[in-house]
């Protein structure tokens, strides 16, 4: 898609990346494998009647008169290869029986059962190959194949053999904005009257009510890892807790309150067994015999800050605790909410019940966020470099349609092995540390790994005092000394340990651990310290550790279900004294839930192939006997081999086979490179890329040609090479590239080559497939008028990184009615800022005065330039938002969308549907009968298309779980979609079916994917942009998945939803204009 950034002000990159598997390491480059990793109106929108729809007319003038639409506004029908397809604006003839009432998608019953007549037969005739003839509009295509293509909506000039296709002269951003305003004068948007003004504050927002439950699809029963929790009939009381002196440790606070309960439960607490949140609140099931009382508590301090050079007496720590009545927790409103008679969830009551059920596990296990871990809950697995995985379980109480529900799931995370520090350091460095001195890099690695870790000393027999490491000494142990009195007498650490403890330090060349604070440094030799058990490792894992951890967490559905049931049995909630005290009873059976399996959509391929249409089977299909619906053109390409294991002949053979596969798949791909293949060393990547590019351009430039594609062969473990190559190609040279790993070059399977061909095709301007329903205008609330579909996400640096910026990405469809191609923009913003700051911007320009910009505005202009029409409907899929951030994100980002639209013309306010996409939840769905092959896929998971919108969903709001993909390994995680704003008034069937069908349009593979592609692309676009950051802020050492790039809870990794203000963030480098025009990110 060709589009320009308005005024050249923003550094947003045109991105919409295709995703690597989450388990694939960063150095895996871009190689494609054979598997993919993976109505009642709402309360918000106005209910004014909309004006009559005016597709293709009513003042919608194309951006360029030579690309004016050919179709009449009344909707004459066009006879094309695909049978009688309707022109833009014509009535859609819905046929009964094939889908939900508003989604009659071809003459098919249920899951692909063909009705009499079947698919329309695509015959020769007017129009492009394999698709209906329809009105032409301007959609710039950079690389057009020489074969006849799908031209449903494009009139493009003949491509040149020596370079990219000629493009129509594009209007500037100012001209496009002027056209928006002209259109407003000629004919007001038919949807603008249906828009409700943005609420004055987030508190006034009401999320849409559920518009009824879906009915489309084959009904079935699934089991969910939700357990019914009976609401207690108790009088809950809240008390404020003040502990003096204040300590940051929840563990210490709990110990203080625990001491009070042990000593004073009967005498002062009236026999009550309270629960405590570790901070400021204590709850009881009934009143305490006082409204305010002070307690004095003494704890033995086991976490000493004293070491070498100070007294060794164990301290007693006195605390003064004031417990004061605060309020009664009202469960009546919770019951009203669960019954659907109250809009807002009473969060306080839910929090109390959650604290009650967490009290006992917190005492038994190691709590991490909402999970609990123990070495006794499963076998430990070594992850390498001194780390091990612990098994545990996630637990959270949730309001659902069936009432209160306890969500239990299995989890694993990394803990530091309880090793002697000497052994830990040896494992960390993967060498014998006594052989040679530590390098500066070794010291940095050790310090980073051990800072904040708790250790216990081993040189004093049974007296195992504990300390927290604050740093590492710069000197060796033998060089360290400290004063022992006020007269300046100095003693070395080696002498002190020999004389005081009779301990001879052997590793005197190693640094000491520094404990305590920096002002009063205290030293502990490494060899007298052992790491305390039960410390979670919160820093970044390397690739091998991630792979090892994923192997531990990967469980087949039946095994996971059994483990969950065993966990519930082991927790014995019926014997939990705190649950008994508060009257909470937990059903130990998995929830049985009604579900539906949505049918897969028909996909359109080119008519020149033997198979022109395909109906996916169990979420997958292949490219055999099919050709891409729009094959791209690659006239001029070259290859650089960065792998020392691949010989030139093998590399040339691989490139030739790949070129042939691209041709077979429907592309116009030259067999021979424009310049011969060359081999280069990874450390010389920039020199090699620029030299090869210049050599190719010396040949092509006199002919008016361009280098269309670079094929790069990378080592399997390539460090930062992949990121460096992408940054140089896309921000410096203006070149799209395809990276292939050495192992795939040697294997060279047909499946792999076919997958790579899919990626190359969309990188050079082609399309792989299109929904047939899109071509026949049968997608409700998408096909009836120009609709733009957005995806947005923010990825954050790992919690261990203190200052790296967060990356926001927004992608948007650029073709209508196909909704297949997505342009994207990215932006760096303040560290861990969740609200997308650059959706809309206004700034002062010295020459032009007040200027508007931002990602939404730029993508709307891009859509207008590509289609010749303004979007009359916006569907916005937002990834990465937790429930606690719903109100802030909706209020801030919906307001930005509104302002971006209004900046293009005063009354331009297309209706918006804002949907949050969540994958980081713990709901799992299991087949009711694992042995029934009709209800499970080959991996034992539920079938793709399984949707649930009852029982375990929100009591009143519009949400659903959708498993849109087939499982590969482990247990499939359904995506959770929650509608926060809906001015388009989707029905449950309409939005569920649209979302499911879009999951079959992901460009990089012939499988349906687990989340809707625009959200998928946005996540990947943001991930790709990290490669563009300068080395001092970029994190190029590891390829952590989304699960490792987001923090949670009120810890250092917490995300902020406060506007960032004027925090200075280094902008990302600009992409080259010719790269922006294509889907280079796949």
From Swiss-Prot:
Tree of life domain: Eukaryota
All copies of domain PAZ, residue ranges: 420-533
Keyword presence, Cell wall biogenesis/degradation: no
GO biological process annotation, one example: regulatory ncRNA-mediated gene silencing
GO terms for cellular component: cytoplasm; nucleus
Pfam short name (any one): ArgoL1
This protein's UniProt keywords: RNA-mediated gene silencing
Domain Piwi as annotated: residue spans: 709-1030
Bias (Polar residues) ranges: 29-38
Region (Disordered): 17-148, 187-208, 1036-1065
Sample GO molecular function, one term: RNA binding
Ranges annotated as biased composition (Gly residues): 72-100
PANTHER family per record: EUKARYOTIC TRANSLATION INITIATION FACTOR 2C (PTHR22891)
Job description of the protein: Probably involved in the RNA silencing pathway. May bind to short RNAs such as microRNAs (miRNAs) or short interfering RNAs (siRNAs), and represses the translation of mRNAs which are complementary to them.
Record family assignment: Belongs to the argonaute family. Ago subfamily.
Protein name (record): Protein argonaute 1A
Organism field: Oryza sativa subsp. japonica (Rice)
Gene: AGO1A
